[in-house]
Amino acid sequence: MNTGLVVFICCVLVAVGVTLHLRKHDMLPIIHKVVDNTTATLVADTVKTKKPVVKRDFNISGSLKDTEGNGVAGVIVSDGFKCVKTDSRGRYKMKRDSLARFIYFSVPAEFEVPTHSATDRTACFYQAVSNKKKIYDFTLRRLPDGKETSYKMIVIGDPQVTNAYSPYYTSPDDNPIKKSDVERFTTQTMADIKQTIKSLPAGTPVYGLSMGDDVQYYGGYNAHLERQIRQALGSSKMRLFSVIGNHDQDGKALYRRKWEDNFGPTDFSFDRGDEHFVCINNCFFYRGKAYYSPGELRERQMRWLKQDLALTPKDKKVVLCYHIPFTFGNAPFGKAKPLGIKSEKGHYSSSRLSQLLALLHQFEGGYELFCGHTHFACNHEIRYEGEDVMEHCHAAACGNIWQSNINICGTPNGYYVYQFIGTRLTDCYYKGTFWDKNKQMTIFKAQTDFNGESYAEDWGLSKDKDKNILVANVFNADSHWRIVAIEDGKEYRMHRISSKGQDAFAAGYHHKYSESVSYRFVSKGNSYLLMNHLYYYVPKNPNARITIKASDPYGHTFTAESTDAVSEPFFNYAHYYEQENQEYKKARNSLLRDSTINRQKDSTQSNNHTKH
């Protein structure tokens, strides 16, 4: 017989025997009860551990009232994903996005810009989102005289303070000292801004706008760096907003969150006078690392922008503010369009530029495009889809990332002062840090050797190098300026250089002194660098004294003399500030005086000793 079959039959007989035994002694019902109870307990335990599904309620509401308790109607309120407007009683309601970090409003033109504190006058127009909070109320303070008809806007490109102490050659004898970037921004840029504000007529409304890259975590992460720069930016009398830059994020959620913790939302708007300012984060990172240039916007940002502009009166001027230029860049997103400009080969316009311009064309007051990022000054003008487009690309307050006092285009560290009257941009000038506001250019001799660099070689002027060719670097110039050389009482239009390339003086200077930034960044090796504010003139008489006259579109004329031409490879205007030079001379003279007095004392004591 099969062994397996025998085993099976034996098992069946045992099972039958056990069952009969249990039935005989009435044990079977007890066994069934135990099994049933055990199963019930297991099921019950399973039910207990399953958490109930809680549906979050993202519906929020609130009100905007003035200090007297009156509702403020028609104000845009947003969560960064959608926009709504307050009703006639100042109330609003919306379903916020689950990813929203802030609820905020677009500051109306008739009201003050709220700030973080009396001593930190950076804008605070938002509340952080809490899952437990359903009501977000805001109180607005009316401007004493209502909406401003005229005001100044100070625009600061790239403060870009780092956690490093960059060597800074501050004295004529090449003795480097180390100052923190925050200290330099505070004691130089902000100190000069305070003087500019002080020089304005009493009662002039002044606002500020940082174009992003407030910080860069070069030299290591510093959890306090964003707060330090916010306090510096907010230390003057102007109320200031900030755009977020690529280095404020560098593709890291921690960095971006730190910026948001200090400045609030990255996509927002506000009104001043008859202008509607829209600030938006156009730093689009590829897989969290490299960023696209020109700047780009995500689809959800375009939806937000369309809603914001749809709720904005069409008689206003729109000033679109962002960090990376939209009209040029050489690290493009796949759908970006080649510019097709021979002198700017390799540059592209943003894939969003057509859509943005279509949105901006709705506004009767026109529009302006404001950006930063480049560390060179450039009013970039292109012919785009049948339209003349200008983008104001602002030079950096930090210049070549605090390695000197100049940007890589030779423009001094500084900031811009705009004036708006109604919907008109009526004035704009560049204010070099610690420079006189009327000094708007520097003059060079084309053949001068700046540490191996020269304008004659860079721009193909070598054939006339014996004629003392003059080069004028006119910091804020564009095609609407008129730049002439006056020789023997006669005016001659200067030739404008507009192409990719370098500024010979800045390249040569930084080649020697820039320790933390590569030479490629400031030289011809930087294919991103566009130079369009250099002008040259070939004198009729190489020995003539020549006056350069630059006239801007706002009615201002600035002059410089050929005798002012920089002829030294490391001219001190980039080396140190005059204020610091005076301090240096004072200290040096004091040391010399003390040394002379000590020598005289030693001589007197020696003579007395000899007599004895």
Predicted regions and their residues:
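A short, amphipathic beta-strand motif
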Residues: 60-66, 90, 138
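Binuclear metal-dependent phosphoesterase catalytic core
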Residues: 388-477, 481-488, 529-562, 591-592
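Short amphipathic beta-strand segments in non-cytosolic proteins
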Residues: 56-57, 63, 68, 74-85
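Short Pro-Gly-centered beta-turn/loop motif in secreted/extracellular proteins
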Residues: 93-102
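Extended active-site neighborhood of metal-dependent phosphoesterases/phosphodiesterases
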Residues: 109-116, 123-132, 219-313, 336-368, ...
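Short, acidic Ser/Thr/Gly-rich low-complexity loop/linker segments typical of extracellular
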Residues: 75, 81-94, 496-502
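N-terminal active-site segment of His-dependent metallophosphoesterases
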Residues: 30-59, 97, 112-222
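Aromatic sugar-binding surface patches on proteins
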Residues: 502-537
